[in-house]
From Swiss-Prot:
EC number(s) given by UniProt: 1.3.1.2
N6-acetyllysine: residues carrying this PTM: 384
The keyword Nucleotide-binding is assigned to this record: yes
Family, similarity comment: Belongs to the dihydropyrimidine dehydrogenase family.
This protein's encoding gene: Dpyd
UniProt name for this protein: Dihydropyrimidine dehydrogenase [NADP(+)]
Positions annotated to bind substrate: 609, 668-670, 736-737
Localisation: Cytoplasm
Binding site for [4Fe-4S] cluster 4: 986, 989, 992, 996
GO terms of biological process kind: beta-alanine biosynthetic process; circadian rhythm; CMP catabolic process; dCMP catabolic process; dUMP catabolic process; purine nucleobase catabolic process; pyrimidine nucleobase catabolic process; response to glucocorticoid
TM regions (residue ranges): none
Amino acid sequence: MAGVLSRDAPDIESILALNPRIQAHATLRSTMAKKLDKKHWKRNTDKNCFICEKLENNFDDIKHTTLGERGALREAVRCLKCADAPCQKSCPTSLDIKSFITSIANKNYYGAAKLIFSDNPLGLTCGMVCPTSDLCVGGCNLHATEEGPINIGGLQQFATEVFKAMNIPQIRSPLLPPPEHMPEAYSAKIALFGAGPASISCASFLARLGYSDITIFEKQEYVGGLSTSEIPQFRLPYDVVNFEIELMKDLGVKIICGKSISTDEMTLSTLKENGYKAAFIGIGLPEPKKDHIFQGLTQVQGFYTSKDFLPLVAKGSKPGMCACHSPLPSVRGAVIVLGAGDTAFDCATSALRCGARRVFIVFRKGFANIRAVPEEMELAKEEKCEFLPFLSPRKVIVKDGKIVGMQFVRTEQDETGNWVEDEEQIVRLKADVVISPFGSVLDDPKVIEALSPIKFNRWGLPEVNPETMQTSEPWVFAGGDVVGMANTTVESVNDGKQASWYIHEYIQAQYGALVPSQPTLPLFYTPVDLVDISVEMAGLRFPNPFGLASATPATSTPMIRRAFEAGWGFALTKTFSLDKDIVTNVSPRIIRGTTSGPLYGPGQSSFLNIELISEKTAAYWCHSVTELKADFPDNILIASIMCSYNKNDWMELSKMAEASGADALELNLSCPHGMGERGMGLACGQDPELVRNICRWVRQSVRVPFFAKLTPNVTDIVSIARAAKEGGADGVTATNTVSGLMGLKADGSPWPSVGSGKRTTYGGVSGTTIRPIALRAVTAIARALPGFPILATGGIDSAESGLQFLHSGASVLQVCSAIQNQDFTVIEDYCTGLKALLYLKSIEELSDWDGQSPPTMSHQKGKPVPHIAELMGQKLPSFGPYLERRKKILAASKIRENDQNRACSPLQRKHFNSQKPIPAIKDVIGKSLQYLGTFGELNIMEQVVALIDEEMCINCGKCYMTCNDSGYQAIQFDPETHLPTVSDTCTGCTLCLSVCPIMDCIRMVSRATPYEPKRGLPLAVKPVC
């Protein structure tokens, strides 16, 4: 019987058929068979594939940069968050890229969006369409590494899209007086012409400055400028443009459509007569450039300029853009697109979606001279557009009133670098449609006359000061395409940003007021920023719950000063002693942990240190505390002190610290290395009696609150906390570092190793690795000693992890390792993150969110995937022949949809308002304690099983393997489709979910049938002894 029991049953053997096995010999399979195998499992496009994927009517996102939450978190963690970051210097709007990526890595998507919109009111648009390879990404320091630069655009898009889903309005800066109390200058009438990126940016910043009478006049019946009319839906959806315009309108900016600057409507002169104090011209370049060879050609014949074609595509593909139905332009057969700029590639890929059978991109120079960014070119290449370089157009061939082809001549570059055209080399191409994206101009005489008397330059564009965006008329400013300096959306946004400050300066001067010489544009604000995160503990009011632990970030008091200036709510000094116990440290003494694996740089999950307490004198610390309290009376400063088990020493040092003006004291009874050998730190903190007595001595000596810092290196931390309370402590810090040995090299020597003898000692492990230990300690103390203040420390590296400790019963949060990974500026992320987490709890519509994470949609590569099973009743993976079938099914579905999704009604944005009170910090302290108990209190009747989303599954089989070799063999793995299927033998252990590489691909759902454990043998069978 024992042999039968210890061998897998036949049905289990069948399940294990694809489970990894150790290879005993080389594998042999024919080349022909391997070629077939390759095709079956291929996920990327076959290099020999010449079949164009059917894209008609398919305006789904095609950007390579798009990220889901999983991808965004991985990419954000990979970022180095560099000092003086080159990426920021390369961003036209000077986004604080390092900081917003820090926020994404910490799952503070609101904080990231706030940083982005603070410098760029069109942050989501730019995240989608910015040519980042030529801007921020081009300066990324990770270009110098094997893994390459960060996908900054994708991260920017992700964070701002999550914020968009929160439906939170923009508000005026809380630093401004109420509108009715603003000076008269802020009621000045300001007009902006053109509702494109430059004007939206300019108006947004002016409104943030406090101006209340801002009007944008837009010629079209839709808003957004080229973002709406010429950037395709698959790159920039209209609801994104509308969202950013609604954010601007939240501040009171008005938009009047159907009204333009022209001698027929409004001129600068009439504007001034009507009381406008300043104007901004952001009308773009409305008219297309046309080569003489296209004169007389019409759309009926098959000729379009990009200014004709792209708006038609937009109207037919962007729901909510127009109040009327507009079909897509019918583009059939072969299409020639002239030029190799970004607009040309937009035309080419749009033509495929309008029914083109083949698209030829024809351009004068070679591939090395293509003006478009690599991202755009790559998309066109992937969609099988054909590239024809070194051709210059000569004439269009028309037959029976229709275009049938074009004639070109070859171009060459001579030895001097000049491009010449060889009229003897003639090339003719058949075509049904020709699209000419040859650029744009401003040549409407009515518009030019309406702009009088401003001066124009030799290119026929308004002449502006490049620093102020001011025209020759001091009250008129201009930016965007109409000025000719901005070549991208983000540069147009920056033109508007620049102009806003100097419009402000000009208006204020008209009212006799001065502005700072250094521009100080207000940040982006929402109701989230009004959330109060102050907290009271032991009679002390903390402006926010985040502070410096008594560790490396508090090595000196100038460092504490910088931390307070950055926004930290409190700080502990580095632990100091009486002069008779002064120490000298060894080196090396602080190292990265092995727990992060081969991850180098920031984001280390642990550090180990063998550093002792401060090398500085008690006098230094006491004098410095006095200075800091004088300059930062609202910040809490706690003096951390340490002595041996000596009553007089504790009384002397505690009185000295109190006299310095410290708000409170921390008694370090827990340093796990070095100090214990001196009868200090751990030597005092592991014995309840010693802890109780030390606390009594200090209580007799001082009136200020004091907290005992506990060590996790004990059997029962609650008994130590109880002893501290009995001794008169006002609370405890839980916990200090965990004693450990981080690693040994291949020669057996430790790291860190000190001196030529390569000696070491057990050190203190810190960081997120010890968070489970710290959470356990905090919850255990909070449950045993209700209401007893706890200062948490141990793996706090974000607002999300900080909230976990608050829920566990802590009142304030000490940070060290996270600062070692980064710098003091992480406090901004922690504060905005905590405010957002509290605010979102008040919104009923977001009740299914996990913190700042929205529910995960079924997706691949961050883009929604159709449920093929719903379209055809069959599950198909996304590789090989199944992927091709999926594409064909999707293409047929898109053609069937045709006009179904072309909504006519304008988009309406609904704000989510707080229906419930926004919790204060005190309201969330200890919230999780109700869920903690003994194992015997857990419900064995309510069981769960795993449910796999086949559309998200990437078919790696990790769930299958862990279930086989560490679980219950409850997952089958199809040998052809590699789709895993969970059987009814699933016990709900959750290992599969734990190792799945795709976030939320596996969910644990309630078991529909009673759980009956497999006992191996019936309970009545007696064991063999």
